[in-house]
């Protein structure tokens, strides 16, 4: 019994020299591992069905009996029968290559790449493969067992038509790929890819000498029965050309070959069969290129002796597929990094099939990972490269050895790697051309799990790797952080990035420069770079690589043009589906029948999913286009707005509402995800593998999914017609035309149909397995399939209990049959087995007793696993010295009973009790002991020689999920053992340090590795002028700065729009309804109206600041953004205090859920909420709107930090932005502090407001936005009515703008219950706040203490004045602050609110003016900063001194930046600015001189920050009053000098500055409305007297 060969040949072309044609297959996985691999040997076993395998690809494929008859043999005749079913040498008598070949119909899978797969040389035609080396001494298997014959020389001679060979394994069979990740045979012609032996050593070259003598044989000779044919030429050398396959001509193929020769002059010398009537176009389209029918190797072979050739041994093979082109050459991607010449296409041949040599040391590859492109008239010839190569193998005698070193195209560097093992193919792929390399921290983010679900990764650790982007694959290398990597480095992990989307994550709470990559497998990863520049470079590099792959799939050279056309097509599809969806919704409203409604709803759901897919692809293509053009990435909000409700629910479950999570969810449900499980070596039951198609073939079944498959009776009993009927139409009828068209246009929308994808070229070769009743059948083992996966799949199909069976592999080693029992988690795809056996387990009783010795323990570890709702106990490991090992307990045994109790009924505590007992009775289900004569292997052969780690999954970072396990050694302890693979987690054994080299240096170093190596190809001159040079352009700092500024403005506009929507959609309608009380409305919306007014004003400020530079889009240097950056930073500085409005809103937000829960019980409220959100979009819910202000105010520091990072560290705008960042961080800290205070004391404040008496409340509200100070003071004179105090109580003092609140909170525990003789026992209602008192501002006084040392003692006196109308006596509070500084701050805040009270009384107003129309550097908008300016003529005389003093005081208080300078001892004195002024004051003082420009007229806003010297001089020469000049001299601040400033006289100078501002208000009162006041940089007007200050 052998694994069926995956390659077959077709006998279409017969000349004097015959082509050796091969077939390529694909695999769908991307996994690297520590495991090494080798090709699997041909199977052995039971013979009766070994000649009866048939391909399921063609509706005209003949059966095995017919093939035998055509070859002159009787079906199942004595000659071909095997007398010993279990004979390990059964292949000696088999002449048929029973190798099902993938049939490719372009109409079935056009979305894959839209091209045909040409059948290349069979595996037997690949000489000198590692299998011959592995089984070289097997005389029984192969003729001349100890001898190896090579049919070629080192100089590259062609194949011998007749030669004796051992069975070989080609290198190409070890390469497998995903839809869009191709490895072509020509790619494998590199010296590293010739064959598996080439990497391992050059010992094979000596065998070539033996073959040189055979080359001179001119006439074909028959192959003996013990010899092996190595190509189609070998098989048919005995016959003349013109033999007609299947007894007749094949018109399609004949026409195809004729046209092929007409297109390729090199092939014109071949004689073609007569052309058929039908004609094909001179240049066949890839979607219409005819494909040969697949059938057994023996078809058309009329010589019975050839049929008995040893070359027909059936075995398992994996081959590569070149779907696009031989080299992928005529389809250049974006033109990055050069390509090869035109002539290189014609010269490349796959020396993997006709030459063998050892690669020179240090030889690497030169070429572009973006595709070795060829343009001009010959570009199209690459389509037929594979076929032409195979034809010329048997005719060309001048192949050069060096031609194997052809340029490495993107098909190689981006190809899906072949297996979990780190084979030579893997190593070669990892040595492809480097697009980008650098040190990155990596963490798992999202992982696609079972049932198409996306979940957060469980093992989420940041790990450091050296990451290299080669093609469309990210390789992760472990490095010491000092030396980087070289061409010998082996990647530890790999991540496939084709069709990925990369998004920056500036909102990451802990790390900067983070980006997220989500791929088409439904996984997402977080990466952290070292700088913003690196982050942008990685995004551009990955998107460019993906764009290259898109162009390659569509066979286009102009990537930009392709992307634009695809975007246009997608927009049309989106428009059409949206219209259809709307029509369906309209129809739904008019339909009453429930069945019809359900049908319409299902169709609407399909449209929604299609729209999501289209929108995702549209966004992805726009990202690629932006990266290629060096532009700005599209706004993700537009994409997220199209998420359907189920998707939003899923993202809500994840807690991540982003492009990455959206992309992962969409990808998880598309057809591409069928590959995903092949990327992980993890255990999972077959029932959970929804993306894996049923892989058992040739089985009797009536299930719907297998209707298209021939049954075993049809294959072996009913002959060819039955098979034809079974296969007819399965490729034509299962995929509708519309689906095909959609797939051609957009490959990523394609979803595979299990009914039609029966061994399409994307899947793998079946392997024989034997059931317990000796019934043989076939199954497909894919890369990543573990022993448990395969066992569960087979058992489920045959209605067997997988827990009662185990999987055993049969090997043939040195003429002896040996067996190997793999671990459940072991990847059996890597093993070179002959066949799989399903064997029943046995049950046995084990009784274990502990002795009195304390050292005795059971010595085994149990793992609890829930499988399909059934709890099972498995032995995870057994200690060799333990009692369990002595009794025969083995790892992997299933525990059925413990002490006569069923294991499934035991919980962890019961297990602990059992394990702690002195004796233990176990009923276990285990593997039987080996039978007599059965040999068990310890280290089975793998595909590549090397150490095999059976216990570790090859992608450790992709497999882990903590389960429950119990250690029997410690009866009371529980340990954790892996239960089932969970998801990607990039783990490494140790953390790597930061590399000493910069990432750019090392990326260049990686590229130099390939530039240093010789190559036969030279760069194409066309690439030197490639139109795609923009793809390599990275965003400059100016571009990034402009991008951040635009993001700030755009997001601010969106935010203001959302706030207005919240008011119009929810607040105003709710005020008219009765669902909620006024208090509940206050909790929900708080001071939302004030916030909206402020944000509208702030947005105008930002927009006007950006308008200072009219040609912002044209700026190319960072220093040209100086005006804009000063304006933006100044806006945040000026409005910093106004942002404290958010304190009240954020503080009350904690109560929002309690109010909204009312919707669950109040149907009217719920109906209102539903009516306001008719589409039920998560982004339009009330909860979503209410969280936006909190998110926005915390976003500002992040945006400022991005601006800050892009400016020159020595520039003044850099310093300016730094101050703005610190200010906004203080605002955020203030908001957080207010929220904590509200949570603790909010109830007290509400109670104090409610307890007020009188018709009009003195204090309307105690809002967190009005809280100026919170401190703790000692109450020196508590009243006796409050009881005795062991020590003076400590009060919490709150200074609001409208009142001072004093609260005493008792920290003691709740009192015990009170028991009285005259009443029942009750609990006293415990109130922790024993004292609370509110002093309104109208009744507040501060008195100076008579004690001279009061200031030193930090004591102050607060008075609540008496009220005769309310009958309230005067109350005095003697308070002691913690320090004199604390007392000073406290009194400062109190005096501040008292001054506000007096000002309100003076102006007869009830509140402070709210709007302050100000934008830094904004002309009239500065009026608010300098004081009110009525529209009056300046010609009017100056007001009186008393009015000036009053206006001065008013202007100073309107200065939003805190300008209150208070003398603690005398509140009546003019306040003085404290020396420790805030950052805002210092910035204003240092950057601006207000007074110099008070008298300037007719100055435009565009003159602000002008570099015009004449303008500056004109300002300098302006006349100023003497008094104003003196004030100016006192207030003028010299240019900031770093490190040499001092704080001397800071307070006095700031006082003068504010006086200056006040005077300007006086003079400005008479100014006309048309005049403007301008702020300019202080450095432009440096006065003669300079004062240095230090921040």
Curated annotation (Swiss-Prot):
Lineage: Eukaryota, Metazoa, Chordata, Craniata, Vertebrata
Record's protein name: Rho guanine nucleotide exchange factor TIAM1
UniProt biased composition (Polar residues): 340-359, 412-422, 958-975
Annotated Low complexity bias: 53-67, 367-376, 1014-1028
All copies of domain PDZ, residue ranges: 845-908
PTM characteristics: Ubiquitinated. Undergoes 'Lys-48' ubiquitination at Lys-1404 and Lys-1420 by a CUL3(KBTBD6/7) E3 ubiquitin ligase complex composed of CUL3, RBX1, KBTBD6 and KBTBD7. 'Lys-48' ubiquitination at Lys-1404 and Lys-1420 triggers proteasomal degradation. Ubiquitination at Lys-1404 and Lys-1420 by CUL3(KBTBD6/7) also requires the membrane-associated protein GABARAP and may therefore be spatially restricted within the cell.
Gene Ontology CC, one term: kinocilium
Keyword tags: Cell junction, Cell membrane, Guanine-nucleotide releasing factor, Isopeptide bond, Lipid-binding, Lipoprotein, Membrane, Myristate, Phosphoprotein, Repeat, Ubl conjugation
Tissue spec: Highly expressed in brain and testis and at low or moderate levels in almost all other normal tissues. Found in virtually all analyzed tumor cell lines including B- and T-lymphomas, neuroblastomas, melanomas and carcinomas.
Comp. bias regions, Basic and acidic residues: 8-19
Assembly and oligomerization: Component of the Par polarity complex, composed of at least phosphorylated PRKCZ, PARD3 and TIAM1. Interacts with BAIAP2. Interacts (via PDZ domain) with CNTNAP4, SDC1 and SDC3 (via C-terminus). Interacts with CD44, PARD3 and MAPK8IP2. Interacts with EPHA8; regulates clathrin-mediated endocytosis of EPHA8. Interacts with NTRK2; mediates the activation of RAC1 by BDNF.
CDD domains given in the database record: PH1_Tiam1_2 (cd01230), PH2_Tiam1_2 (cd01255), RhoGEF (cd00160)
Modification Phosphotyrosine occurs at: 829, 1323
Effect of residue 622 to A: Reduces PARD3 binding
Region (Disordered): 1-70, 305-380, 393-422, 933-1034, 1456-1481
Family: Belongs to the TIAM family.
Alphabetical list of InterPro entries matching this protein: DBL_dom_sf, DH_dom, GDS_CDC24_CS, PDZ, PDZ_sf, PH-like_dom_sf, PH_domain, PH_Tiam1/2
Gene coding for it: Tiam1
Organism listed in the record: Mus musculus (Mouse)
GO BP, sorted A to Z: activation of GTPase activity; brain-derived neurotrophic factor receptor signaling pathway; cell migration; cell-matrix adhesion; ephrin receptor signaling pathway; positive regulation of axonogenesis; positive regulation of neuron projection development; Rac protein signal transduction
Molecular function as annotated in GO: ephrin receptor binding; guanyl-nucleotide exchange factor activity; microtubule binding; phospholipid binding; receptor tyrosine kinase binding
Disulfide bond entries: none
Pfam families: PDZ, PH, PH_Tiam1, RBD, RhoGEF, Tiam_CC_Ex
């Amino acid at each position: 019994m052998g694994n069926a060969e995956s390659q077959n040949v077709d006998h279409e072309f017969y000349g004097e020299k015959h082509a050796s044609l091969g077939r390529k297959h694909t695999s769908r996985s991307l996994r690297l591992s520590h495991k090494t691999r080798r090709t699997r040997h041909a199977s052995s076993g039971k013979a009766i069905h070994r000649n009866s395998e048939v391909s399921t690809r063609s509706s005209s494929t003949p059966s095995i009996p017919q093939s035998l008859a055509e070859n002159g043999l009787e079906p199942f005749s004595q000659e071909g029968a095997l007398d010993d079913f279990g004979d390990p040498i059964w292949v000696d008598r088999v002449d048929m290559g029973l190798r099902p070949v993938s049939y490719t119909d372009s109409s079935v899978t056009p979305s894959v790449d839209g091209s045909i797969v040409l059948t290349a040389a069979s595996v037997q035609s690949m000489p000198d493969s590692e299998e011959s080396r592995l089984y070289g001494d097997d005389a029984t298997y192969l003729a001349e067992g100890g001898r190896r014959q090579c049919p070629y020389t080192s100089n590259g001679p062609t194949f011998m038509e007749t030669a004796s060979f051992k069975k070989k394994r080609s290198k190409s069979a070890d390469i497998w790929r995903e839809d869009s990740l191709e490895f072509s045979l020509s790619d494998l012609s590199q010296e590293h890819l010739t064959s598996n032996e080439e990497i391992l050593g050059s010992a094979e070259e000596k065998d070539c000498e033996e073959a040189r003598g055979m080359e001179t044989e001119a006439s074909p000779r028959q192959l003996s029965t013990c010899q092996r044919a190595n190509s189609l030429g070998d098989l048919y050398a005995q016959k003349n050309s013109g033999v007609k396959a299947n007894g007749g001509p094949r018109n399609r193929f004949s026409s195809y070959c004729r046209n092929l020769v007409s297109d390729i002059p090199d092939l014109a010398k071949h004689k073609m069969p007569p052309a058929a009537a039908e004609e094909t176009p001179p240049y066949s389209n890839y979607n219409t290129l005819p494909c040969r029918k697949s059938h057994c190797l023996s078809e058309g072979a009329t010589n019975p002796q050839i049929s008995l050739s040893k070359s027909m041994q059936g075995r398992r093979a994996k081959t590569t597929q070149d779907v696009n082109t031989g080299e992928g050459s005529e389809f250049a991607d974006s033109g990055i990094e050069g390509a090869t010449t035109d002539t290189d296409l014609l010269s490349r041949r796959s020396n993997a099939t006709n030459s063998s040599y050892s690669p020179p040391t240090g030889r690497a590859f030169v070429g572009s990972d973006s595709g070795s492109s060829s343009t001009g008239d010959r570009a199209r010839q690459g389509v037929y490269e594979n076929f032409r190569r195979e034809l010329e193998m048997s005719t060309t005698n001048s192949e050069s050895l060096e031609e194997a070193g052809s340029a490495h195209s993107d098909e190689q560097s981006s190809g899906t790697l072949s297996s979990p093992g780190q084979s030579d193919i893997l190593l070669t792929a990892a040595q492809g051309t480097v697009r980008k390399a650098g040190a990155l921290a990596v963490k798992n983010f999202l992982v696609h799990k079972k049932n198409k679900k996306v979940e957060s990764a469980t093992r989420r650790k940041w790990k450091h790797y050296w990451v290299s982007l080669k093609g469309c694959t990210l390789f992760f290398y472990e490095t010491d952080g000092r030396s980087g990597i070289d061409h010998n480095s082996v990647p530890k992990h790999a991540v496939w990035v084709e069709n990925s989307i990369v998004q920056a994550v500036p909102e990451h709470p802990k790390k900067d420069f983070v980006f997220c990559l989500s791929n088409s497998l439904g996984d997402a990863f977080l990466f952290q770079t070292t700088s913003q520049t690196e982050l942008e470079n990685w995004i551009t590099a990955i998107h460019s690589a993906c764009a290259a792959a898109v162009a390659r799939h569509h066979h286009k050279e102009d990537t930009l043009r392709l992307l634009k056309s695809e975007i246009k097509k997608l927009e049309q599809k989106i428009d059409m589906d949206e219209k259809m969806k709307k029509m369906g919704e309209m129809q739904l409203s008019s339909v009453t029948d429930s069945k019809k409604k359900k049908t319409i709803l299902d169709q609407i759901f399909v449209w929604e999913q299609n729209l999501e897919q289209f929108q995702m692809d549209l966004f992805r293509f726009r990202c690629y286009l932006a990266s290629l053009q060096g532009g700005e990435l599209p706004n993700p909000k537009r994409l997220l707005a199209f998420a359907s409700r189920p998707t939003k629910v899923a993202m809500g479950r994840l807690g991540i509402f982003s492009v990455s999570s959206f992309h992962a969810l969409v990808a998880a449900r598309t057809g591409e995800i069928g590959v995903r499980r092949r990327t992980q070596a993890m255990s999972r039951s077959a029932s959970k593998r929804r993306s894996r198609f049923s892989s058992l073939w040739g089985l009797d079944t009536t299930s719907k999914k297998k209707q298209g498959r021939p049954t075993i009776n049809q294959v072996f009993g009913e002959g060819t017609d039955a098979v034809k009927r079974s296969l007819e139409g399965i490729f034509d009828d299962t995929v509708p035309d519309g689906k095909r068209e959609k797939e051609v246009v957009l490959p990523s929308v394609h979803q595979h149909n299990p009914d039609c994808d029966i061994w399409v070229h994307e899947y793998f070769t079946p392997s024989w397995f034997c059931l317990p009743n000796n019934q043989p059948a076939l199954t497909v083992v894919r890369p990543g399939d573990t022993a448990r996966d395969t066992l569960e799949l087979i058992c489920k199909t045959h209605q067997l209990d997988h827990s009662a069976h185990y999987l055993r592999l049969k090997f043939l080693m040195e003429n002896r049959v040996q067996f190997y029992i793999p671990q459940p988690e072991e990847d059996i795809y890597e093993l070179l087995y002959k066949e799989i056996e399903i064997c029943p387990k046995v049950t046995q009783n084990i009784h274990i007793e502990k002795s009195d010795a304390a050292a005795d323990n059971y010595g085994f570890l149990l793992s609890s696993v829930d499988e399909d709702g059934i709890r099972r106990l498995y032995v995870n490991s057994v200690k060799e010295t333990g009692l369990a090992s002595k009794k025969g307990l083995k790892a992997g045994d299933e525990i059925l009973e413990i002490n006569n109790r069923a294991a499934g009924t035991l919980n962890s505590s019961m297990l602990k009790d059992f394990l702690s007992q002195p004796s233990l009775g176990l009923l276990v289900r285990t593997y039987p002991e080996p039978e007599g004569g059965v040999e068990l292997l310890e280290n089975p052969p793998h595909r590549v020689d090397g150490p095999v780690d059976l216990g570790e999954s090859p992608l450790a970072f992709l497999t882990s999920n903590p389960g429950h396990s119990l250690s029997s050694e410690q009866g009371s302890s529980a340990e954790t053992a892996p239960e089932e693979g969970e998801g990607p987690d990039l783990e490494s054994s140790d953390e790597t340090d930061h590399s000493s080299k910069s990432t750019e240096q090392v990326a260049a170093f990686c590229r130099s590795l390939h530039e240093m190596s010789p190559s036969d190809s030279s760069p194409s001159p066309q690439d030197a002028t490639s139109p795609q040079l923009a793809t390599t352009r990275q965003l400059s700092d100016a571009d990034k700065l402009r991008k951040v500024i635009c993001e700030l403005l755009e997001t601010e506009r969106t935010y203001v729009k959302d706030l207005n929507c919240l008011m119009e959609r929810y607040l105003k309608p709710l005020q008219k309804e009765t669902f909620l009380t006024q208090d509940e409305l206050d909790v929900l919306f708080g001071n939302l109206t004030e916030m909206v007014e402020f944000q509208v004003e702030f947005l105008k400020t930002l927009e006007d600041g950006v308008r200072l530079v009219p040609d912002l889009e044209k700026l190319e240097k960072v220093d040209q953004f100086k005006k804009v950056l000063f304006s933006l930073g100044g806006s945040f500085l000026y409005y910093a205090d106004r942002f404290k409005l958010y304190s009240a809103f954020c503080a009350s937000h904690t109560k929002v859920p309690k109010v909204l829960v009312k919707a669950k019980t109040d149907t009217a409220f719920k109906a209102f909420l539903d009516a306001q959100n008719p589409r039920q979009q998560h982004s339009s819910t009330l909860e979503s709107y209410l969280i936006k202000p909190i998110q926005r105010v915390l976003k500002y520091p992040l945006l400022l930090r991005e601006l800050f990072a892009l400016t020159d560290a020595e520039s003044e705008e850099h310093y300016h932005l730094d101050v703005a960042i610190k200010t906004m961080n203080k605002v955020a800290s203030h908001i957080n502090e207010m929220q904590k205070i509200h949570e603790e004391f909010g109830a007290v404040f509400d109670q104090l407001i409610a307890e007020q008496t009188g018709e009009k409340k003195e204090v309307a509200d105690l809002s967190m936005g009005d809280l100026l100070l919170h401190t703790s003071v000692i109450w020196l004179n508590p009243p006796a009515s409050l009881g005795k105090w062991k020590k003076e109580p400590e009060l919490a003092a709150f200074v609001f703008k409208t009142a001072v609140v004093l609260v005493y909170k008792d920290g003691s525990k709740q009192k015990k219950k009170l028991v009285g003789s005259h009443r029942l026992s009750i609990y006293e209602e415990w109130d922790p706040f024993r004292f609370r008192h509110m002093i309104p501002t109208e009744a507040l006084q501060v008195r100076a203490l008579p004690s001279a040392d009061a200031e030193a003692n930090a004591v102050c006196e607060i008075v609540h004045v008496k009220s005769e109308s309310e009958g309230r006596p005067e109350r005095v509070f003697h308070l002691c602050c913690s320090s004199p500084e604390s007392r000073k701050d406290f009194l400062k805040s109190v005096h501040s609110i008292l001054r506000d009270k007096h000002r309100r009384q003076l102006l007869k107003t009830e509140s402070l003016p709210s709007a302050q129309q100000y934008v830094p550097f904004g002309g009239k908008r500065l009026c608010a900063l300098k004081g009110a300016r009525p529209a009056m003529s300046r010609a009017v005389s100056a007001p009186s001194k008393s009015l000036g003093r009053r206006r001065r005081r008013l202007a100073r208080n309107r200065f939003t930046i805190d300008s209150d300078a208070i003398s603690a001892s005398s509140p009546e004195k003019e306040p003085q600015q404290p020396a420790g002024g805030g950052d805002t004051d210092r910035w204003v003082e240092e950057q601006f001189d207000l007074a110099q420009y008070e008298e300037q007229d007719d100055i435009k806003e565009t003159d602000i920050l002008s570099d015009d010297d004449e303008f500056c001089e004109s300002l300098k020469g302006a006349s100023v009053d003497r008094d104003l000049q003196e004030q100016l001299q006192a207030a003028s601040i010299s240019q900031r000098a770093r490190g040499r400033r001092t704080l001397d006289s800071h307070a006095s100078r700031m006082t003068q500055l504010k006086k200056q501002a006040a005077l300007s208000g006086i003079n400005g009162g008479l100014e006309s409305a048309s005049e403007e006041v301008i702020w300019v940089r202080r450095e432009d007007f440096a006065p003669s007297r300079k004062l240095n200050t230090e921040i």
